[in-house]
UniProtKB/Swiss-Prot annotation:
Primary localization class, coarse: plastid
A cellular component annotation (GO) from this entry: chloroplast thylakoid membrane
Membrane-protein topology: Multi-pass membrane protein
Subunit structure: NDH is composed of at least 16 different subunits, 5 of which are encoded in the nucleus.
Matches recorded under InterPro entries: NADH_UbQ_OxRdtase_su1/FPO, NADH_UbQ_OxRdtase_su1_CS
Full protein name: NAD(P)H-quinone oxidoreductase subunit 1, chloroplastic
One protein family per Pfam: NADHdh
One function term, GO molecular function aspect: quinone binding
Length: 363
């Protein structure tokens, strides 16, 4: 059987087109992921700068001012310094657990960003169980901290890892119950559906007004999950040197530093999505495109406005955990566990029962 050379060339050209389509498909799949990672990195740098400026204002001192204009590049300078430092590994510790622990903590928090909607149809993965995916993924981070503490072969590190695990278990349950109440109100566990359910009723439709008790419990539980003062017992300097971070240096120590701010940012974003209306401005009589004389059909402008509103609400809310760090003293371990199990858990259960009853009566 003789095959014409033109037929062979045609077949080869089709195979090349198919391979090019596959390459373009992979590139288009990676573009939103890379964009999200870059955006998160910039967001974390902004949080570090904001925290230093706000804490300097609270303490009536001058914050960073030499690294770039207004000290905005100070976080970048600190990160570069950590990259250049020596990466020490304890000789008597478990090398694999010691090395894997920080990566697990960072990756698990990074995955949480995939279900956060930054605007209308601007979410990496609109899952039907989005909020519970976040809770499930965030519960993996303490496992990484426990591995780091155990792998360090240091009593202070191990005790810090145990505290992190105990604290996470104590406050995950009230947090999950508050999220379940929001899901019942919105008739969905998708983050996009929850935002759209709030937008139906405008500013007064925010879950902040419909779930004030749940909001307070969620706020306290998220602070505990982020290990921020007054809940920073896993790394209490006066008791545990630096907790599970004691034996770390260089880039691995930097990963823990990044993980804490990533967790703070993702918690604030979920407060915005669950309680503050997400990307919707929700102010009566004001529609942003009309305010600037732009047609409602401008999708690009609408997307940018949605991102801006989401981030504005998030960074305004961030003032609360930052100010709390420099205002309240650290709790004792027994006080922390009592607060979680004896107060927040019954309150969140009662809030869930009230929400369920109101939803049943409204049927």
């Amino acid at each position: 059987m003789i095959i014409d050379t033109t037929e062979i060339e045609t077949i080869n050209s089709f195979s090349k087109l198919e391979s090019l389509k596959e390459v373009y498909g992979i590139i288009w799949m990676l573009v939103p992921i890379v964009t999200l990672v870059l955006g998160i990195t910039i967001g974390v740098l902004v949080i570090v700068w904001l925290e230093r400026e706000i804490s300097a204002g609270i303490q009536q001192r001058i914050g960073p001012e030499y690294a770039g204009p207004l000290g905005i590049l100070q976080a970048l300078a600190d990160g570069t310094k950590l990259l250049l430092k020596e990466n020490l590994i304890p000789s008597t510790g478990d090398t694999r657990l010691f090395s894997i622990g920080p990566s697990i903590a960072v990756i698990s928090i990074f995955l949480s960003y995939s279900v956060i909607p930054f605007g209308d149809h601007l979410v990496l993965a609109d899952l039907s169980i989005g909020v519970f995916f976040w809770i499930a993924i965030s519960s993996i981070a303490p496992v990484g901290l426990l591995m780091s503490g155990y792998g360090s072969n240091n009593k202070y590190s191990f005790l810090g890892g145990l505290r992190a695990a105990a604290q996470s278990i104590s406050y995950e349950i009230p947090l999950a119950l508050c999220v379940l109440s929001i899901s019942l109100l919105s008739n969905s566990s998708s983050t996009v559906d929850i935002v759209e359910a709030q937008s139906k009723y405008g500013f007064w439709g925010w879950n902040l007004w419909r779930q004030p008790i749940g909001f307070i419990v969620f706020l306290i539980s998220s602070l505990a999950e982020c290990e921020r003062l007054p809940f920073d017992l896993p790394e209490a300097e006066e008791e545990l040197v630096a907790g599970y971070q004691t034996e770390y240096s260089g880039i691995k120590f930097g990963l823990f530093y990044i993980a804490s701010y990533l967790n703070l940012l993702v918690s604030s974003l979920f407060v915005t999505v669950l309680y503050l209306g997400g990307w919707n401005l929700s102010i009566p009589y004001i529609f942003v495109p009309e305010l600037f004389g732009i047609n409602k059909g401008g999708k690009v402008f609408g997307t940018l406005i949605g991102i801006f509103i989401t981030l504005a609400k998030t960074y305004l809310f961030l003032f609360i955990p930052i100010a709390t760090r420099w205002t309240l003293p650290r709790l004792r371990m027994d006080q922390l566990l009592n607060l979680g199990w004896k107060f927040l858990l019954p309150i969140s259960l009662g809030n869930l029962l009230l929400t369920t009853s109101s939803q049943l009566l409204s049927l």
